[in-house]
Amino acid sequence: MVSRLQLTVEVTVKLLMLRTATGEVNLSEFLVETRLAGFDGIEGPIPANPAARKELRQQLQDNGLVLIAESTTGSDLTASDWWIPRPERTVPDHLEDLRLVAERAVEVGALFVNTMCGRDSWAWSEQVDFFGEALELEQQIGIPISFETHRSRSLFNPWITRDLLQIFPTMQITCDFSHWCVVCERLLDSEWPILELCAQRTLHVQCRVGYAQHAQVSDPRAPEFQEALLAHERWWDLIWQSQLQRGFSQVTMTPEFLHDGYMQLLPYTGAPVADVWEINCWMAQRQRQRFVQQYSAG
C-alpha cells in the first residue's frame, strides 16, 4: 500500500503536488483517493457541462484540493489519439479552444491553465501569431496560462521554445522535459543555456522522466534509469531555484507517468511492465522530500 506523503518540516515556499487526471468516471472516489494519498490537487480537463463544472468545484473544495486546468487545443477530443493536433485546425481554432478552457477555469477556481497548444508544423509566422494572441487572451480573461513543452506541439523542441521566449517576455511555460529527450535523442545537459532560460520562465513542472528513445522510462526506481532520473532532477532544481528567486510563495509539480502509449507493455499480453499509480506516488514522495531538504526553513 502506498503511504501518505507525510512531511511536516516547514519550508519557505510550499510545494503543491498534483495528481494527473484523465477523465475519471467516479469523481468523488478519485478525489478522495487523491487526498488520502497526500496529493494537494489534480491537473486535468474541465467538463464542458455546467452542472459537472459546479460539481467539480464543490468536490474540490470539500476535499481541500486545488486544480490546474488542462487545455488541449486543435484536437479531436473524441478520437483515440485525442492529444494530437489536427492539420485542418487553424490558429484561430486553437485560440478559441484555449479561450473556452480559460473561461471555464475561472469558473471552477483553477490556479491556472496548462495548455498543450499549437502545432509543430506551423510556419514561424503562425507560431508568433498564436502566442501573441494567446498572451492577449490571458490578460483579457485574467487567469495565468502556462504553455507546455510537448511533442507534436509548438514547443516541441528547445530551440523554438527559446526563440519564442525571447520574443514574448511575459510568456510562462510548463516544463515536461521528457518530450525533448526524445525529440533531441539525448539528455539535455548540452542545452544548459536554454534550460536556464526555461527555468526563468517556468510556472509549472510535469515530472515524468524520459530518455533518448522514449518519453517515459518504464520505472524511474530502476537502477538502469538512474542517469535519466538524476538528469531530470538537475533540471527541476534549476527551476525551483529560479522560482524562489522570483518570489513564488508556492510551486506546483505533477508526476505524470501515464498509460496511453507511454507505459511499455509486455508483448502478446499487453500487460504494463510497471504500476503507473505506484510510480506517481513514489515520484511525488521523492520530489517532496528533495524539496524540503533543499528549501527547509530550519
Language model features by range: what are they?
Residues 17, 46-48, 73-76, 117-121, ...:
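Active-site-proximal loop/turn and secondary-structure-junction residues that shape catalytic pockets
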Residues 5-19, 42-44, 65-72, 113-115, ...:
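Hydrophobic faces of well-ordered beta-strands that scaffold small-molecule active sites
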Residues 57-76, 131-142, 167-168, 233-237, ...:
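Alpha-helix-loop-beta-strand connector modules within alpha/beta enzyme cores
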Residues 75-95, 119-126, 216-226, 262-272:
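Surface-exposed, active-site-proximal loop segments in enzymatic domains
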Residues 83-172:
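Active-site acidic/histidine proton-transfer and metal-coordination neighborhood
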Residues 2-5, 28, 167-171, 182-298:
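Histidine-acidic metal/acid-base catalytic patches
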Residues 1-100, 106, 281-298:
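N-terminal pre-domain/capping segments
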Residues 27-31, 53-58, 124-133, 153-169, ...:
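Distinct, well-ordered alpha-helical segments
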